[in-house]
Amino acid sequence: MNQTQATFPSPTDVVSLATAKEHLRVEHSDEDTLITTFIGVAYDHVQAYTNTHLAETEVAHYFDHLHEYTNIHVGPRVTINTDSGKGVSYVNADGVKTFLDAADYEFDGGSYPARLRILNEPIDVKDTVNAWQIDTKSGYNNTTRPDAL
């Protein structure tokens, strides 16, 4: 599996500069750049350590082949991104990217790892690297993010 992050939320959407300065008891703006850098580093570290997205993030996952149940290690609160030009797709025998209808797969984004099951697997999938692409949205928003994070 290969994945590419499509959106990069700002770490200060999760922890604001004002919140960090209050926590650090800093009342001046001389160190704002440094504190903002620390927020970004902490944000990246927590995401890597917990394997979660702290803010809603779009990610494209690529697979050579899909199994009966394909695990997608990203979270939390995963959904298939069905925005224009996104979803569950494959490269067909003619080399054309083809999207599956929602009726052709089941997706469990509430579990970890998230699971995808193809119900009606197409017969014209090209035997190539990254033949399958699954576009997801995952992560917390301001109302669902646990206080501990």
Enumerate the predicted regions with their spans:
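Divalent metal-cofactor coordination and adjacent catalytic microenvironments
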Residues: 1-149
